[in-house]
Amino acid sequence: NIPGCNRLAYFGTSSFDAGVVAARLLSDRIAPEADILVGSIIHRGDGGSNQCRCREMGFRDYLGRAGFRGRLLGASLRLDDEGYNRRVLDELFEENPRIAGAVTFNSTCYILANYLRSSGHDGVRLVGYDVIRRNREMLEAGVVTALVAQRPAAQGFHGVMALCDMLVSGRRGPSDNLMPIDIVFRENVRFYNSHII
């Protein structure tokens, strides 16, 4: 949801609140003084998306209100450079042995999950976003603790329907249409079908 873009309609989650949900999921599973790794996995360029920034704001806001006393440790990782990522993360974990949680704010938490699994950091709780195939595999394997999901097929369906209503009948519906924030665990992922509208 990008303010000021003259959109017909937005169908999706509140990114800020999705960040709050991730913080709650993670902070309920680690000690208040434990450190959290914030993995920024760069797809292109050097900045994250508006959605990722809003998720991180919600995450930080919740931790600030919840009595979190640990540190948030950032790591900028690369989408297609496993060697670089390993060097960055090895150094970060060596210098910060109190890391007990990790989060990514885009759909590529499997990159961080691969590192955690291969480097023996089994105790780190990882929360990510979106039930894409590789994230789902890591969730089913128990490497990812939880995924925050947003029903992309339903978003697309409702968006196309809003466009059809506008083009066919001239009706313009509400511009902001917030959808549920789904929490997916290893135990319920087999029931999660994002294509059900």
Functional labels for PLM-detected ranges:
Residues 8-9, 35-47:
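Short beta-strand segments enriched in small/hydrophobic residues
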Residues 11-36, 85, 151-168:
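Hydrophobic alpha-helical segments within soluble ligand-binding/sensing domains
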Residues 38-41, 103, 184:
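Short hydrophobic segments within beta-strands
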Residues 74-134:
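Hydrophobic alpha-helical
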